[in-house]
Amino acid sequence: MVLTPPSKALWAAELPRAAWTVATWWRHRPALAAAPRGDGRTVMIVPGLFNTDRSTAVMRGYLNRIGYRTSGWGLGRNRGVRTVGVEAERLIARVESLAAAGPVTLIGVSLGGIMARLVAHRRPDLVRAVITVSSPYAGSPKATNVWRAFEWLTGERLDDPAVVLRSDAIAGPLPVPSTAIWSRSDGLVNGLICHDAAGHAVEVRSGHLGVQLKPEVLIAVAKTLAG
């Protein structure tokens, strides 16, 4: 089956949906507070394309409050391989620095989830588990409305044989536990390429922009971490 990018209607709804999430966030405080408590493990959150640690501040703050030790990725703005290196070597070094007391759980938003999976494939000894949030790792990257922006921002061509080979490796079964949080109403990436048959998947109702702020997503992350 050939998968296509989300519809123009879903794409056009992205900003209004993100604004609605922010405007109504307070309504969900009781449900957020009732989520399972954490076990103190170290969690690193990797931001999406062209985003920084500021974009994951709400998620990190929430997970800190319920009992986890969270960290941003500390690499500035995410511009793909221009930021982390072709084999994510700079991100691996950051994870290694946090893993002195034991493997780290990686949560990646969109492109950040693809990077988290690459780290887990290359250095499974450093990674306890991977949670991806709206990360299009499991199918054609052209089943998105942002693939041209990806090529421009990262300097990579999606049809480059080396990029295709790396993408195929990232999509392969992980050597650590994994969960993919995805939405079929995502307006930027086709939700069907954000999860696969080999791993655990959790479907939510969300757009793509600001997905890491969505209370339903935060609760899904908390429940996944609690296992």
Specify the residue positions occupied by each region the protein language model found.
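Flexible, membrane-associating and regulatory peripheral segments of lipid-active enzymes
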Residues: 1-44, 50-52, 56-61, 66, ...
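Alpha/beta hydrolase fold serine-hydrolase catalytic domain that processes acyl esters and thioesters
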Residues: 2-24, 144, 151-154, 171-176, ...
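A broad, low-specificity signal for short, low-complexity segments enriched in glycine/proline
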Residues: 3-8, 32-33, 67, 136-145, ...
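Surface-exposed loop/turn and secondary-structure junction residues enriched for glycine/proline
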Residues: 25, 35, 52, 78, ...
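Serine-dependent carboxylesterase/thioesterase catalytic core
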Residues: 42-47, 52-54, 58, 64-77, ...
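C-terminal catalytic-base region of ester-bond hydrolases, centering on the histidine
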Residues: 174-227
